[in-house]
Structures are given as structure tokens and as C-alpha cells.
Amino acid sequence: MRPKQVWVSVAFEGEWNEKKPYVTESIEAGVDVIVCLPEDVERVKELGNVKVAVPLMPESPGSPDLALEELDAIDADVVIVGKGGEGDGSIDLPDDISESIDAALIEKARDRGFEVAEYVEILDKPYERFAAEIAKNVGPDYVIAIGRDWKIIPLENLIAELQGEKTQLIAGARDAEEARIAFETLEVGSDGVLLDAERIDPSEIKKTAEIAERAAAERFELVAVEVKEVKPIGKGDRVCVDTCSLMSEGEGMLVGSTSRGMFLIHSESLENPYVEPRPFRVNAGPVHAYIRVPGGKTKYLAELRPGDEVLIVDTEGRTRAAVVGRLKIERRPLMLIRAEYEGVEIQTIVQNAETIHLVREDGEPVSVVDLKPGDKVLAYVETEEGKGRHFGMEVEETIVEK
């Protein structure tokens, strides 16, 4: 599942000091896009590195080129078409999408190198149809669907229509609760939501960003695998993954020697008599091992770089993304752990040390030096045959990993 986006609009007439608190809150909450008027783009970008969208407001349907030339002079990332056009009812809807003025503007903006969003107020069924048609036939990067007076709209039809299209659906929401509904509709949900700063308290921005993060989180069905073998195997280069996040007891990362079977390696968040806890760290294993990262992908531990994202996973299989801050690669004694689940054999290699833990089936951490055949620990196992990975992406092919 791709990340859910949060957009915040401060594109209203007013003093900058009225808009600034919303922009600051948006940047601190990590929103994806801030919508503002052209004269505010520079001010927004001075406050933080954030994508900025600007409405294209031609004075008349005949002057779009002039408006686009004016936008060329500012540092906007996304152009929003539809305000003052067909999208908001200022111009009648076309009989055919090939005659659409908004569609022509989308093409012109795209030719100038902008990302493009089509703004559509869903005033009635024909406007819902127009939003779907422009997504399918013109392919803007985004369609922003807003209800009349920003009232929440039924998204089921648009979500179903846009399944498989490259255009992302951004739904208008009046608060965090409406955002949650948008993200959960038909299980898939909208790709993002747009909050209007004129209609919300700034606190709704952070709440919505948190909901978006949870909505996009992957979840794994962890199973209890039976340990078959535990043995020292000599020295090798192992990797500690130091993140920019703190982990709690019961959290770690999924790591394994094969992509179809990965053990939950516990974080160094536990008290022990040897070293101080380092709750930002997972001593993950040797350089060859796979680790789960967002988007249904894996990476080799040796491939990770500062700034990459990895998945933190808890004992219930819930996930959250964390940014890698540092990798520590050191030569250490290693241990092979081999396990089995429903006839599928999986294995991993870890540092042979008291401070490295897996997780028992009851959720309790267990040091790898205390593991023995017959013990059961938590892991993620892909039991479906015929799937392999190329460059970390799951593909249908025959690959045997031992």
C-alpha cells in the first residue's frame, strides 16, 4: 500500500500571519502538500522543504497561457486546475471530455513540467462522472474531490472507478475523523485528503497526519515457527540498524536469509547487565540478510543507507516506518537459526551474543543464546509457492533459496 497523503490549503485571501500557524503546523506534522496562493509560495518554502501546490486562476477561459507563464516565475510544484473552470462549476461541463477546457489546461501545465491536479466540486452525479472521466482520459497526477460546502461525499464510486489508474484521489475533509473515513472507504480508501485551513483548528492537522500514517501501515500475519537448529558458524560482518525512532519492548524488525521467511528480531530496548539499552537499534544480522521495508519490499542489509526507511514491527504484526540514521557494520561471531512452519523451512543468521533477542510465541523476548530446538518464535512466512523477488519486489517466478 502506498503512503496516504495529507494536503492542507491556506489558499484564502488574508494576512500572512493568519496563514502562517497552519503552515508551521503542517510542516511540523509532515504533511505532503501545502496549497497556497502564488504570492505565498516563497513564504511557505522559507519555513520548510515541502511540496507546494498553487491554483491556476485564469481571468477568463481564454487566458490560461498567461496564467501559466506567471506560474513559471514562482517555485510551485503542483498546478491545480478546475477552480474558475469546469471543476467548480464556473464553466459548464463539456458534452465530451475531448472538448474540456480543464483537460486542455492540464495538458498545458504538464507540458511545462508541473505536476497537475484537477479540482472538482462534486455538486451532483455529472460532476462525479466528470472527475472519473478526466482521471481516465487525461491522467492528471491527482483529482481533488470536494463536496458542496466541504461536506463529506460518498467516495465509493470514485475509489472504484480510479482503481488501477495512475491518478491519485485526494478527498476533501473537514477534520481528522472525516479523513479517517476517507482513508478506510472500501478498505482501499482515498490516496489522500485535503484540509481547508479556513475551516479547521490547527490541531486537526497533526491528528490527520497520524491517522494517515496508521492507514498506510502494512500489517503482517506473524506465526509461531518451530526452531530446528541453532549452531555457531564462525565470524562475519553483521549490521546494526540505528533508526531515528525509539522502539518499545515487543518491537523489532523482520529479517531473514530468504525473502519468504523472516524472523522478528527484537530491538535493543531491553534492560540487561551488559550494556545500556539502545531502543533506537536492531542488531539485525549479517550483510546478506533481507530486511522488510515499506511498500511490500525488501532490501539487503548491506544496501541500506542513512535516510532509507525500514519497517518497525510489533508482536501483533503492526508496522510503522522508521528512518535509518546510521548503520554499524562490524565483524562478529555468528549463529545460524533454522526453523520450520507447515513444511516451509526458513533461516537467519544473527550475532552470537546474549543481547540479541527473538520473540517467543507468547510475545516474550528470548535471547538467541538460550534458543534450542523445539522452541517456537515469531516470524513472517510466505507459504504461497512460485513467488520470488527481483530488486526487492515480489514477482511470479520460480526461485529456490536455501
Swiss-Prot record:
It comes from the Archaea. GO terms for biological process: amino acid biosynthetic process; aromatic amino acid family biosynthetic process. GO terms for molecular function: 3-dehydroquinate synthase activity; dehydroquinate synthase activity; NAD binding. The keyword Transferase does not apply. Keywords: Amino-acid biosynthesis, Aromatic amino acid biosynthesis, NAD, Oxidoreductase. Transmembrane segments: none annotated. It catalyses: 2-amino-2,3,7-trideoxy-D-lyxo-hept-6-ulosonate + NAD(+) + H2O = 3-dehydroquinate + NH4(+) + NADH + H(+). Its EC number is 1.4.1.24. Pfam families: DHQS. PANTHER family: 3-DEHYDROQUINATE SYNTHASE, PTHR33563. Catalyzes the oxidative deamination and cyclization of 2-amino-3,7-dideoxy-D-threo-hept-6-ulosonic acid (ADH) to yield 3-dehydroquinate (DHQ), which is fed into the canonical shikimic pathway of aromatic amino acid biosynthesis. Belongs to the archaeal-type DHQ synthase family. This is 3-dehydroquinate synthase. It comes from Methanopyrus kandleri (strain AV19 / DSM 6324 / JCM 9639 / NBRC 100938).
